[in-house]
Amino acid sequence: MNSKLEEKFNKCREDTFIDLDKFLLENKYDDVKILQKQTSVKEYFCNDEGIIYKPQTNLYECYVEVIMYNLAKLLNIDCAYYDLGFDSDTIGNITIDFKKENYNYYSLSNIIDDYREFYKGRHSSIEVMVYTNNLENIWDALYSKYYSLDNYEEIIKKLMDQLVEIFCFDLLTINNDRNTNNLIIVESKDLTNISFAPIFDNSLSLNYSKTSRMGVEIDWQEYDHFTLLAKFLNSSSIEYLDKFKIMYEKFDISLLKSAIIATEQQINGNLPNKIKEQLIHNFWENRAKFGDVLENYKNKER
């Protein structure tokens, strides 16, 4: 996080929320671009710096976006910066545009679509395989994109490790909104630096009122996160299972409370007790179910 920008945010903070109109006026962000018409997501620019404002209709989701940013930091997962904000009509989240000059950005969806188009008509089952979005076929799609580079094996290994880390984080936080459109791969123009961009759109985490969209290797309309975890445990390599177990053990209630404290420090105020209580309740409910799945898996191992 840019400390100078954080200082500017805090100067415009009122009751934990940043007054967006005041911030834009004082810091001369006078260029605006509408990113999503339906949700009124806008990006504001000052020179080469951009901030994005996303209105939220649900107060819980507004707070969770910031809490998940702080939780991801504690787990050493690269996440876009989020804060609380409001304008004349709405409350919402402010984030900083992580895009830089001399870099290209591709959604995982773009890469999978290119892979499907390339192989269409050559393999009879390829479209069905690709649309399951399982880890094996994502590996194939990445191979199809990068195999011509000398260090393609290193690149693909790095990307797959990052993807599994994000996947485990989403499982543990019940993120209902991760999909191939908001998983972004960033490439330097000379292709010496290729990785996943910081994760974003985490407002539906630890939320049992939403239907999961995280359909990796399953039909999301028929399965839940716990079925997804069971399939992951039974079909993944030991290396990836170890990643999940390490994150599961690290993400305990004390870490969630640390993320809440970090959020309160960031916004210079206290989170509503109702929000904290709901978060902690959802954490324990989720933890208990995951514990059952892991125990069943251990029994199968024996």
Regions found by a protein language model. Give the residues of each.
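Generic structural hydrophobic/aromatic packing signal, biased to beta-strands
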Residues: 45-47, 53, 82, 95, ...
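C-terminal catalytic region of ATP-dependent kinase domains
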Residues: 73, 189-302
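A short, terminal or domain-edge coil/loop segment
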Residues: 28-36, 132-148, 211, 229-238
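ATP-dependent phospho-/nucleotidyl transfer catalytic cores
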Residues: 99-168, 278, 289, 298
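Conserved ATP-binding subdomain of kinase catalytic cores across diverse folds
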Residues: 3-126
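Conserved kinase catalytic-core segment
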Residues: 60, 134-211
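Short alpha-helical "patches" and their helix-cap loops
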Residues: 80-88, 179-189, 299
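Regulatory N- and C-terminal appendages and interdomain linkers associated
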Residues: 1-33, 153-158, 188-191, 270-302
